[in-house]
Amino acid sequence: MAIRVYNTLTKQKEEFRPLREGEVRMYVCGPTVYDYTHLGHARTYIAFDVIRRYLEHRGYTVLMVMNFTDIDDKIIRRANETGEDPKELAEKFLRYFLEDMKALKVKPADIYPRVTEHIQDIIDFVRKLQEKGYAYEGNDGVYFEVRKFKDYGKLSGIKLEELVKGARVEPGEGKKNPEDFALWKKAKPGEPKWESPWGEGRPGWHIECSTMSTKYLGESFDIHGGGNDLIFPHHENEIAQSEACTGHEWVRYWLHTGFVMVSGEKMSKSLGNFVTIRELLQKYSPEVIRFFVLQKHYRSPLDYTEEGIQHAKNNLERLYNTLENIRVAMEKADVAFRWDEEEFELYETVREARKKFYDAMDDDFNTAEALKAVFEVSNAVNRYLTKVEKPKESVLRKALEFFKIVSEVFGLFEDYFKEQKAGDEEALIELLVSVRAELRKQRNFTLADKIRDELKALGIQLEDTPQGTIWKRISV
């Protein structure tokens, strides 16, 4: 089954066909760094992390770009409130954001472009729009003339006449029409500013993403993502700028995450009903937060309650208990000289669940449905282990392989599998030490020394003592 994604642009699910065979280029709108990351933000980044992981699991090479807006009205306001330098304030919260994402096991983007490091690129982009007749200079900045872009509203469904109705140009604004938006803002006293053809100033919000995504992913790329709240005006304006500049389709698939809700309202800083990732991590493990998010499809609203996240914690513990049951059983499991009905029953459950997992993820990355398949395997494993006196290692390994796929795609159980891998490595090292000891007894020192030297090159140092050979890890 081919991967199908819901495209906000076409309002339907479509077969996923990237522009370049075997490669996916994706851009996710990053944070404006003026405060701590809350669960509403993290929901989006966890969702796109899983989308990226799944695409990579399916064999695609993914080039992922996520920006940082490190100069903006919100940053300037917060800096004025706290008395901090806007640059230092943005740098501080940028670092906090990266720390939070690392804690949540969100894989780093390949490129994290910052607005303040791409000012000249933004100026060049605005000049192109001006040259093509889509932008004009007003007394307080440079504006995009929305009426000149005939496809305006194609993402959000907003009609131009709806924007114009009841709107007006405020006194002192330099725009021609109320719907026009700023590409470049002329400097105000005390604000950060850069030289430009229009005098000192700073970029508008929407132009930043158009510029940086195009710079690193090209004039057309596969996926642009963000939260539902960015569809209008941010993403609508991005399309207008980018397609006005290039003259062709900019992004093939637009993906948007649903809101995190608290008592029926969107979690947001403006309402003050948010919980930061740092607060959550004081009470719950990173995997509990990931699991809580993945219990819902990424486009659906996600209701945040203490009971809900505790329920996620309990469900995750059930799966960890199953993995531990597998580990213990495999230590004493028999080699399979035959399979009986119980082995075939577990095998069939794992096989069918694996198909359900892939079908769910192929269907617009439906993590909620995929998790149902995971619990089917969990329940089947525990039933099997209560039924049989001597479990078979080979059928348990089938279940474990399925859990490894889930781990790779969902970013769960990673510590468990690291421990398993470490245990396997140690067993292999012990085997090589034993083989080397036998070679030394046979006075085959050439081959014994080769094992010692090869292990050292891999970071394992052997020391021969009167009590036998011991080994330890070293840096290489």
From Swiss-Prot:
GO terms for biological process: cysteinyl-tRNA aminoacylation. Its cofactor is Zn(2+). A motif ('KMSKS' region) lies at residues 266-270. Pfam families: DALR_2, tRNA-synt_1e. Its main location: cytoplasm. Zn(2+) binds at residues 29, 209, 234, 238. GO terms for molecular function: ATP binding; cysteine-tRNA ligase activity; zinc ion binding. SMART domains: DALR_2 (SM00840). Binds 1 zinc ion per subunit. Disulfide bonds: none annotated. It is an enzyme of class 6 (ligase). A motif ('HIGH' region) lies at residues 31-41. ATP binds at residue 269. The keyword Mitochondrion does not apply. Its EC number is 6.1.1.16. It comes from the Archaea. CDD domains: CysRS_core. GO terms for cellular component: cytoplasm. Keywords: Aminoacyl-tRNA synthetase, ATP-binding, Cytoplasm, Ligase, Metal-binding, Nucleotide-binding, Protein biosynthesis, Zinc. The keyword DNA-binding does not apply. It catalyses: tRNA(Cys) + L-cysteine + ATP = L-cysteinyl-tRNA(Cys) + AMP + diphosphate. Belongs to the class-I aminoacyl-tRNA synthetase family. This is Cysteine--tRNA ligase. It comes from Thermococcus onnurineus (strain NA1). The gene is cysS.
